[in-house]
Amino acid sequence: MKVSYGITVHNEAEELKRLLNILTNKIDKEDEIVICIDGDDEKVESVVGEYLSENEAIVYKRKLDGDFAAQKNSVIENSTGDYVFHIDADEYPSDGLLEYVKPILEANDIDLIWVPRVNTVDGITEQHIQQWGWRVSDAGWVNYPDYQSRIFKNSPEIRWKSKVHERIFGAETFSHLPPNETLSLYHPKTIDKQEEQNNFYSKLM
């Protein structure tokens, strides 16, 4: 079984470097990394260039043009694996998730796996929590398990839809991983980054 780890990146150079370091040390040789770059960020290009000097990956540029679904669909179209595991550049998977992703897929003939995500926002205040209607645990996790549709068969029928707050369609069978931090994606960010993203999304809607 071959898994394509698809990454979309804009200007998250340090986050991309962290993610690539994690994947390089954990994924199997037959797997692949697919990187879709939006824009011309020199730091991102430097990180990718450094990675390609010692590793292989499918890398291409594509403008977002306000359409997140089309951007993610382009990753699928450039992937050759049996399954696609989509990860945003500012996220990273737990070691346990990477370790068990293939055994889980091999034991379950399903189209889609929903993955729990640990969101943390450095600098968040009670005012932010009330304003956005978030649930925050004692550990500081926002809206956990915040399930994400990220691991799916590489099939022509399965594609993302909606320009903003995109959702995946075409999967007939699916399952949810248990809400366990050892099987989660991690999504840390600062409050400044959160507010920047909120403003960007509001302009697109």
Where would I find each of the regions flagged by the language model?
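Conserved donor nucleotide-binding strand/loop of the catalytic core
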Residues: 49-70, 74, 78
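Cell-envelope/extracellular polymer assembly enzymes that use nucleotide-activated donors
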Residues: 2-4, 32
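Catalytic-site signature of metal-activated, phosphate-bearing donor transferases
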Residues: 69-76, 92-205
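Short, well-formed alpha-helical segments that are part of the catalytic scaffolds
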Residues: 12-26
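A conserved acidic beta->alpha catalytic loop
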Residues: 22, 29, 33-50, 64, ...
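Short aromatic/hydrophobic "clamp" motif used to bind/position activated sugar donors
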Residues: 84
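Short beta-strand/turn micro-motifs composed of small residues
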Residues: 7-9, 37
